[in-house]
């Protein structure tokens, strides 16, 4: 908050409205602060009447001058990524500056000189949006070239434009004037901005401030007379099988919210700005899959981990498997693709005709190892008698193992150094990945599982429970008689329980 005594205060307001407000920082300036922006990845940006742009650092409680233009600062706006900002000055100049690393960063410095002071300004995904008293809304490219213009000079009912804000997706713009809000949306197909029907509100008077909620669902408008109006910004709503509400707040952004009380939703957004066409909730209502014309989005709803990968339209014949907590397995036309949740790239792709969770094993950093930062391994079937092994970090084949009988189950241990597999004759085999040495360890095997968090193996052979406490010595086996069939091995709070179903 910038005050008229040239002091900027930072308040800690808490999570709830009723919490006590506490001043945590104070920055004294030599000139009046005319505008403020706070990029999510950097310090607070202050625009001053003397033309200086200053950065206020909350951790050190110190401010520094980033640059000086000798022209009154009339607007400061941050980009949606929170890595940079634009400053508008009374002489019409617009300056771009970055406060954090940005892979898509453009050249810093003066971008363009607008015809009037840019009192209303926003930084969209592809353009710089400017408006003011001349009743024009102008869109500049990132290089400062005029791309588009909407001129309302001949509209007698229109007054000067006072403020604007951009949607979190960067694809919708709201511009405020007298008793009116004008809306513009970016058309990905047409590659231009389209004007939507204006919203008129009698006795709202001049709109002096606009803010778009981070999830894109609402716009707050402040007026000259002290009123604050809250508007919904929704393209459409739908309900998925009575369990989830899908709110399309923009072409490339959807709010996915469980209808169950107390549940938190996720913001599904295309990082490339593509229009989201289809959203599905899958995997026991724990995962989502969405499509755009050029990409596919997958996500873990419980951990709010979202991924977007390039994906051409293949007719919608994909099959999805969510048995692994770390990766989504996508099977299409004989090809298996692995997508790690939270990563915007395909982890790996292999050819296989056997798409069964029991015939594929993926380990993604399941257990930390000393001296190993990334450990990602894949085991799958080339044919019913051949197991292939892949290192997904470096993208090369670790080797293959051929068996004399058809394989019906396989699983890597958590470190990816050992592989257990069982054949149709119920023979259990162990393979060391480093040496590619295969050892037969058990006959008549009806159940087998690695104990979570360890290299201990539990299996069943006829009426015996077999345990390997040291898998490095497979000949050392502990056998206990049981009555029934083992159905699961559970490890909780440092204890391991074997679940047996009585016959």
Regions found by a protein language model. Give the residues of each.
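Short loop/turn segments that connect beta-strands within beta-propeller blades
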Residues: 13-16, 58-61, 99-102, 142-145, ...
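Conserved blade-register residue in beta-propeller folds
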Residues: 10, 55, 96, 139, ...
């Amino acid at each position: 908050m910038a005050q008229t005594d040239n002091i900027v205060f930072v308040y800690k307001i808490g999570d709830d409205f009723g919490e006590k407000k506490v001043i945590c920082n104070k920055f004294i300036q030599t000139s009046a602060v005319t505008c403020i922006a706070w990029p999510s990845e950097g310090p607070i940006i202050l625009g001053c009447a003397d033309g200086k742009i200053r950065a206020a650092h909350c951790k050190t409680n110190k401010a520094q001058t980033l640059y000086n233009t000798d022209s009154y600062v009339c607007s400061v706006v941050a980009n949606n990524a929170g890595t940079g900002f634009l400053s508008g000055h009374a002489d019409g100049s617009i300056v771009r500056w970055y406060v954090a690393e940005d892979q898509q960063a453009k050249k810093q410095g003066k971008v363009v000189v607008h015809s009037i002071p840019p009192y209303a300004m926003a930084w969209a995904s592809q353009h710089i949006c400017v408006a003011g008293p001349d009743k024009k809304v102008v869109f500049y490219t990132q290089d400062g070239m005029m791309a588009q213009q909407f001129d309302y000079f001949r509209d007698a009912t229109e007054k000067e434009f006072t403020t604007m804000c951009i949607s979190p997706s960067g694809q919708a713009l709201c511009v405020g004037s007298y008793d009116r809000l004008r809306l513009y949306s970016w058309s990905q197909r047409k590659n231009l901005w389209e004007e939507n029907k204006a919203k008129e509100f009698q006795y709202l008077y001049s709109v002096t401030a606009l803010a778009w909620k981070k999830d894109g669902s609402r716009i707050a408008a402040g007026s000259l007379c002290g009123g604050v109006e809250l508007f919904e910004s929704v393209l459409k709503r739908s309900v998925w099988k009575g369990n989830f509400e899908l709110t399309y707040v923009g072409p490339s952004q959807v709010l996915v919210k469980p209808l169950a009380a107390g549940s938190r939703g996720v913001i599904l957004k295309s990082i490339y700005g593509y229009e989201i066409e289809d959203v599905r909730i899958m995997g026991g209502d724990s995962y989502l899959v969405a499509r755009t014309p050029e990409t596919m989005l997958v996500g873990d709803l419980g951990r709010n981990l979202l991924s977007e990968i390039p994906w051409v339209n293949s007719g919608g014949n994909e099959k999805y498997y969510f048995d692994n907590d770390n990766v989504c397995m996508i099977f299409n036309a004989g090809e298996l693709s692995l997508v790690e949740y939270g990563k915007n790239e395909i982890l790996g792709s292999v050819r296989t005709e056997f798409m069964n969770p029991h015939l594929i094993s993926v380990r993604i950093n399941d257990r930390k190892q000393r001296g190993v930062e990334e450990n990602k391994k894949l085991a799958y079937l080339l044919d019913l008698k051949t197991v292939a092994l892949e290192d997904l970090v470096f993208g090369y084949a670790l080797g293959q193992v051929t068996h004399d009988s058809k394989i019906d189950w396989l699983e890597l241990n958590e470190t990816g150094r050992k592989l257990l597999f069982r054949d149709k004759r119920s023979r259990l085999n162990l393979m060391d990945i480093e040496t590619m040495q295969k050892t037969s360890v058990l006959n008549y095997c009806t159940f087998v599982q690695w104990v979570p968090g360890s290299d201990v193996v539990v299996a069943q052979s006829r009426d015996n429970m077999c345990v390997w406490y040291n898998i490095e010595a497979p000949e050392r086996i502990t056998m206990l008689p049981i009555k029934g069939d083992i159905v699961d091995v559970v490890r909780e709070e440092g204890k391991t329980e074997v679940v047996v179903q009585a016959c």
